[in-house]
Amino acid sequence: MVVLVTCVLAGTALARRLGMSAPLLLVVAGCLGSYVPGIPDVALTPDLVLVGLLPPLLYAAAIRTSLIDFRRNTRPIALLSVSLVIVTTVGVGLVAWWILPVPLAAALALGAVVAPPDAVAATSIARRVGMPRRIVTILEGESLVNDATALVTLRTAIAAMTAGGITVWSIGFDFIVSAIGAVVIGVAVAIGVGYVRRRVKDDLTDVSISLLTPWIAYLPAEEIHASGVLAVVVAGLLLGHKAQLIQSASSRVLERTNWATIGFLLENSVFLLIGLQIRSVLDDLRETDLAYSTIGWACVAVLVATISLRFVWVFASTYGPRLIPAVRRADPAPPWHYTAVISWAGMRGVVTLAAVFLLPGDTPHREVFVAIAFAVTAGTLLLHGLSLPWAVRRLNLPPPDPHEDHLQEATVYQKAARAGLKRLDTEMNGDEPEEVIERLRRRSLDRANAVWERLGGTAEPPSVQYAKLRRSMLESEREEVLRIRRNGHIDQGVLQHVLDSLDVEESVLERSAQDSTAEREVDLVPSGDRGRCADLRTYVDAPRPRTPEGCEQCLDDGTSWVHLRMCMACGYIGCCDSSPGQHSAAHWHGTEHPVMRSFEPGEAWRWCFTHQVTG
């Protein structure tokens, strides 16, 4: 285990340094390592993968997946994770049946084995090269559900191999029962675990319950022959969505850190283990009576069929229904290059290798099926892993704009601050010191203003200057506390509490520093909420600025400003809320002109004071 984790850490660090996909590098390293003398034979057994690795992997992904985004993309996710898996099962099964001397049921089982893509590799590339977020959401949503579809389909094919008498109706019935049972158990586990965690006050106990949750959902579902994988996903989606209501803030931070670490180690260990299987897979082929040319042809044909079917299905299901004018008007088609990238992101992973070992020992040419599953897994990882970054760059897919993110973040903070100040007004009873109330108001507004500051200008805004100086102060404060600790005159528990508080403050400053260093390459023109705001629809054309040299009031007063805003009604130039004068907001209060726009170079966003939305 120590050697495995060490190799994973070294491999991911090397991949990051070389600018390549970590899963791809780890698979190659595993293939080479399988032939190194002294390396033990680590078999990927079904129990190890399906019970030991898959539940925590899926749960870690599910709790960080937005349930709202998942619902918003239900149609494409369902078409990929359910329909495409079935289409691939049938298509690949027919190809294998045509090439290999095996029964149709066994060939369909092979189709189910290679049907589910593994989005870990694709999304790791997606985040590295900057794919649009909707593509990443669809790929992650597909990976959460397609394993369940493939395993249920495989179970049905195995039943047809061993018992016979399986009909289309029985397959459909088994699938529906398995899905419904999994959803019921997943919802029940989410409700039960949520009820318990809401009443647990100790963070360590709360996070420990979280670590058990994947198996609390998986094992009962499998016991009643439902999909344990789908039960884990449902429980994870619901608990992640309700985390703000059932957990304390410190528990949420601790849980995110723990699951991020677990997910990182498991995801990358899996790809190293995949590579380590190559030697045993090739050794087992010596037992087959098929010609190596037939095996090679079958591997290539199944790989090509797997890739081609995804292309055909994704394009057909995306643009076929939109040939109907009513459908096209209600749901316009996405750009073709979005569809092309999703079609090309069909890498296979550990579920394919684990599923092939679920085939009974008496399956005809089982060792050949294992080799084909490995060939499809390794082939898609190598082919897509090497070419997907190039394809994304070649198709000029727009990456997420950090300044667009800052704009949306600032809008949310502004609305949150507004809600918090309203609550403050209702909570006050008149006995509070004025300096306490003013400090609360200032702190609430400063958080939103700090994000607004990062939206433009070349000079360092006050929040960045504060973070830089405060981090330097914290460094000296920590050195002094460590000096006191070396003297041994203060209790270690007291000193550790002080050091922990310094760590918490510095971690917040580090997050702010990372956000402030993000750069954009295009002008900031957000989609915003213009469609829902009458004022933003009205004030579109910019008037002539009255004082293009700077804030009108600051120029009169001889004071300075941070960033500039322009009134879209009269052309008044005022300073932002981070500036001492806050003249832009004062102009709105005095004139009730609702819309202003940024007057910073390269920015075209607007803000409605009345409705608190951007456009």
Kindly give the residue locations of the regions a language model identified.
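Beta-sheet entry/capping signal
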Residues: 107, 565, 572-573
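Intrinsically disordered, low-complexity proline-rich regions
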Residues: 488, 567-568, 605
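Cys/His-rich, Zn2+-coordinating zinc-finger modules
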Residues: 528-550, 557, 572-615
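Canonical RING-type zinc finger of E3 ubiquitin-protein ligases
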Residues: 559-568
